[in-house]
Amino acid sequence: MATTRSEKDSMGSIDVPANQLWGAQTQRSLAHFRISQEKMPTELIHALALTKRAAAQVNMDLGLLPAERAKAIMRAADEVLDGAHPTEFPLAIWQTGSGTQTNMNMNEVLANRASELLGGARGNNRLVHPNDDVNKSQSSNDVFPTAMHVAAVMGVSEHLLPELKVLQKTLADKAEAYRDIVKIGRTHLQDATPLTLGQEISGWAAMLSHSVRHIEATLPHLCELALGGTAVGTGLNTHPEYAVRVANEIATLTRQPFITAPNKFESLGTCDALVHGHGALKGLAASLMKIANDVRWLSSGPRCGIGEISIPENEPGSSIMPGKVNPTQCEAMTMLCAQVMGNDVAINIGGASGNFELNVFRPLVIHNFLQSVRLLADGMRGFNEHCALGIEPNRDRITQLLNESLMLVTALNTHIGYDKAAEIAKKAHKEGLTLKAAAMALGYLTDAEFDEWVRPEDMVGSMKK
């Protein structure tokens, strides 16, 4: 039995593995772009299959594609969407910047599979043509940007935002639970005036609430689809109703509010929607890094650190120090946030590098965008389940550090003035005295006045409620 078959494209014939559905252009790309290990993301492949399905449906409805072929293409696309044929999409991210080779990879796979579904063969004698049928009314230049937006919206809406909202609620619940625990605040990594543990955590929860709104604000632009613009945005070789209809079909299939882009020249020539969208993801990464760093600092110890909170002990932390447990979820979170920030730089460069009617950094952009979505969604789920839900206050340590802080002297500002209060703090620090002892030694207030005026629970403001 032959192990290869001949496939033909505009450059001639080439042998491809007989057991694979792809064709000539995919085989050429495999030969020419043997670069690293990064392959086209599965989310993008599925979005591309969905786009091809929608195009076949609309082309059939408009009378542009015979029903028999259109339905076979749709069945083949559904197989891809259901997880079949995962080895048929082997191409590297590092290929043509328009994604043409991956578009043709999908066209060839669907054409050969549709031919089989119709009782035909693979290869040059197939019953469905990759360009004339599967790619009808399309160009790589509008199909690939469309698939990018579909994959991005689906990833953000169905994976990232749900995990973000769960983590935000966990922190909001913790803020409420610990609203009455007064602790020392810190600025510049130095002691500051008191606040409650609930107030501190409420800041984290608010950061994530803002991130939800920032990310959601980027979705309308991402829901604009380039399909129908064809090669340069003019819609050459498409039916007048095609662009609107195919966007509506994609919206129906995904249950997302996709629309046809009002200006296809912008859709083809830029990656602005993804640049903007990833900017919001980078903002989320910045917030998560701050939260994770605060958590690991506050839980540092167990005996020689701050130790105001405890977090779950999930696994041994050292191969040499017995009993050591580390804040591993915080470390994983900060690392993935750093990667997202790096991805943002690459996306910005890619987005800024379009020329004339087409941006040709698209595989780079979508690879990094979808990686960031996966990292953030998975990271937030793990951080929530294995860290945030288990945050508990160490009340004795909180009280100890609160009572030792020299910054409680700030409560005296309105009674004896800043200069005298500063003198008390300096004397206490230099001579190892309590604030009360230093104040009384200087003769600035009585024992009773100190106890009345320096009350940490009265220093946390109206926000305690």
UniProtKB/Swiss-Prot annotation:
Binding-site positions, substrate: 98-100, 126, 129-132, 139-141, 187, 319, 324-326
Site (Important for catalytic activity): 331
Active-site residues (renumbered): 188, 318
A GO BP entry: malate metabolic process
Membrane-crossing residue ranges in chain numbering: none
Main subcellular localisation: cytoplasm
Top enzyme class: lyase
Subunit structure: Homotetramer.
Protein's recorded name: Fumarate hydratase class II
Source organism (scientific name): Yersinia pestis
Gene: fumC
